[in-house]
Design a protein with these regions (language model features):
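Sec-dependent N-terminal signal peptides
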Residues: 4-15
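Hydrophobic anchor at the start of a short beta-strand
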Residues: 50
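Exported/periplasmic ABC-transporter solute-binding proteins
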Residues: 20-44, 53, 58, 65-66, ...
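Intrinsically disordered, low-complexity peptide-like regions
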Residues: 14-19, 69
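Periplasmic-binding protein-like
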Residues: 71-74
């Protein structure tokens, strides 16, 4: 009996000694999809752990630059992934994993009629329009481009409320703190069971959101990081991303 117990202890310690942990930053736009991707991946790695941290790409780029350790960094664009590469903090060049899509989101379906092109006609009904902060969030930059390209920026400049990342405009709308939001479609697609309704924004109005990742120098000796990246490019992961409303390269 003692030998059996000892065997179990040795096995337990062996499994735990071999267990790997990853710290991964993921832009908020991919938060829900990446949670599912992670869970699917860990089915074949039951002893390992992946900690996902969500937020604005610009904010977490600065934290990484200041010394916060992430093994993988999934940005909402190419800009910050490229910056990490140019800072010589990566093991390889950035790679695109999904293409982001913008949407108008509201609890009031009448504000969505005609799409973004008809927003000017509804300006008097819109008291607050929520966007992600373009200083740190690529989706905020894209939303700003949309407004500028449709000559709506001046019309709405006094009505804009900013969120620190792209999840916040959804919360603003859901809590009636904004009438309308320009958001990541991946957060309000039907699989998310959103409180409001969404309509896609034509991609001709903004620079493509080529969401890219890098493997940082902190993952140098972590086999799990490379295995997870391989899974990201798998058909199964692509199906999950598409399910949430992303395009894939």
């Amino acid at each position: 009996m003692k030998k059996l117990v000892l065997c179990f202890i040795v096995l337990f310690l062996s499994l735990n000694l071999n267990a790997q942990n990853l710290s991964v930053f993921v832009a908020s736009s991919a938060s829900k999809a990446m949670e599912e991707v992670k869970n699917e991946f860990l089915k074949s790695h039951p002893n390992d752990n992946i900690d996902l941290v969500f937020g604005a790409s610009g904010k977490y780029y600065q934290l990484l630059k200041q010394g916060r350790e992430f093994d993988l960094f999934f940005s909402a664009d190419t800009k910050y992934a490229q910056a990490i590469y140019e800072d010589q903090n990566t093991l390889d060049k950035p790679k695109v994993y999904v293409l982001g899509i913008l949407a108008l989101y509201s609890l009031d379906e009448s504000l969505l009629e005609g799409g973004i092109e008809k927003l000017k006609d509804k300006a008097n009904k819109i008291h607050h329009l929520s966007l992600a902060n373009p200083k740190v969030a690529p989706y905020g930059v894209a939303a700003k481009e949309v407004l500028e390209n449709l000559n709506l920026d001046k019309l709405f400049e006094d009505k804009i409320v900013l969120g620190e990342n792209i999840s916040v405009p959804v919360l603003h709308v859901d809590s009636n703190n904004a009438d309308l939001g320009i958001v990541a479609y991946s957060l309000v697609s039907s699989i998310n069971h959103p409180k409001g309704k969404a309509i896609l924004i034509d991609q001709k109005y903004f620079t493509p959101l080529k969401q890219s990742y890098v493997i940082t120098k902190y993952a140098k000796d972590k086999k799990l990081a490379f295995e997870f990246i391989d899974f990201i490019s798998s058909q199964k992961a692509k199906e999950i991303f598409k399910k949430y409303g992303f395009d894939t390269p």
